[in-house]
A protein has these predicted regions:
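Sequence signature of WD/YWTD-type beta-propeller architectures
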Residues: 1-347
Length: 347
């Protein structure tokens, strides 16, 4: 491991993080909705009772408390043009994919105090994730024969080949300790599938699909999946929940995307639902930015299907969304400008 990313992997800012905490809080839109950042972030993670996030323009890592106050820069490594991140379970490390001139790079970075250490990972990795419960990473490598899945330590030592697959366009995930997921890249013009590989049983099974526009997001405990499909008859998305143990599908009867939802693992799911959706091919139009939305934040009970409109998010098109571990907040990114927001639940 090196102090900072490889020189070819990022530009080192020799100035040290000042460690001074900004006294201003996040911008309060109302008593419960808070704008954590005014600038774009390239990913965020929950950290104790606060947040860690990466500033998109510089690649600097910051942390704050739960309402965006006391922001502190904790990284002195500059990596611009970050477009995808995955964090470890305690937000002490991250996998960071970024552009460097004409190349795509992937770095594994460990944040230690006010410094960072990192290594470049192989250039042929097409998808990656962190283990939910231990210090291991998983990644998918494209080969001439298809795809190979590897697990390794974050510095890419102690590699282990997990699985080989025929050629496909999969996004890999690690939703539970013994489960690895493989999801087709979603498009309303192609049928997608979701598979799960059970590490203990060495079994590879289909969970969902084939379905047009299939997008999926696992519950926090990996016991269920929220998923959206493209309904060609209405030219809009539809949202469902699937319970793996019971093999039961629940139609939430709302029009939104799996990427806009969070399931902490109980009876309630939380979804950002657009006020209106123009008929078209989804999620393609949304993912490419040709269509954007103004969302409301809803809570939906998956047993009773009772719905509660929690907030008008005004000009926010929710992209990434996560519940805090203490259940007091939900955080999300605005796809329109990349800013980070938080919503405080009622006590």
């Amino acid at each position: 491991m090196l102090d900072g990313i490889f020189p070819s992997a990022g530009r080192r800012d020799n100035s040290q993080p000042d460690g001074d905490k900004e006294k201003d809080e996040g911008i309060k839109i109302d008593q419960r909705l808070v704008q954590i950042t005014q600038t774009a972030v390239s990913g965020f993670a929950l950290k104790n009772e606060g947040l860690r996030f990466i500033e998109r323009s510089t690649g600097h890592v910051f942390e704050s408390d739960s309402i965006g106050a006391n922001k502190t820069r904790i990284s002195n490594t500059t990596i611009p043009q970050i477009f995808k991140t995955a964090w470890d379970s305690d937000a002490e490390g991250a996998l960071i994919m970024y552009r460097e001139e004409e190349n795509i790079r992937l770095a594994s970075v460990l944040f230690k105090g006010t410094s960072s250490e990192g290594v470049l990972l192989p250039a042929d990795i097409i998808s990656f994730d962190y283990a939910p419960d231990r210090d291991r990473i998983i990644y998918l490598v494209k080969t001439s024969a298809g795809l190979t899945t590897f697990a390794a330590n974050p510095d890419n030592t102690k590699q282990a080949e997990i699985l080989r697959l025929p050629p496909a366009d999969f996004m890999i995930g690690w939703p539970a300790a013994n489960s690895i997921s493989f999801l087709s890249r979603p498009s309303g013009e192609a049928e997608g599938v979701l598979y799960r590989f059970d590490i203990n049983k060495n079994s590879f099974d289909k969970v969902l699909g084939p379905a047009l526009g299939l997008g999926a997001k696992w519950s926090s405990n990996g016991a269920g999946v929220m998923y959206s499909i493209y309904d060609r008859s209405i030219k809009k998305p539809r949202m469902f929940v699937y319970n793996l143990k019971e093999g039961k599908t629940i139609d939430l009867n709302v029009q939104t995307f799996a990427q806009k939802c969070s399931w902490p693992g109980g009876e309630d799911v939380f979804c950002a639902i657009p006020t209106s959706i123009t008929a078209g091919i989804y999620p393609d139009l949304w993912l490419t930015g040709e269509e954007s939305f103004n969302d409301h934040l809803w809570k939906i009970n998956i047993s009773t299907l009772q719905k509660k409109d929690l907030a008008d998010l005004q000009d926010i098109d929710v992209n990434e969304i996560k519940n805090s571990g203490d259940g007091k907040f939900i955080y999300f990114q605005n796809k329109k400008d990349g800013s980070l927001w938080g919503f405080r639940f009622e006590e």
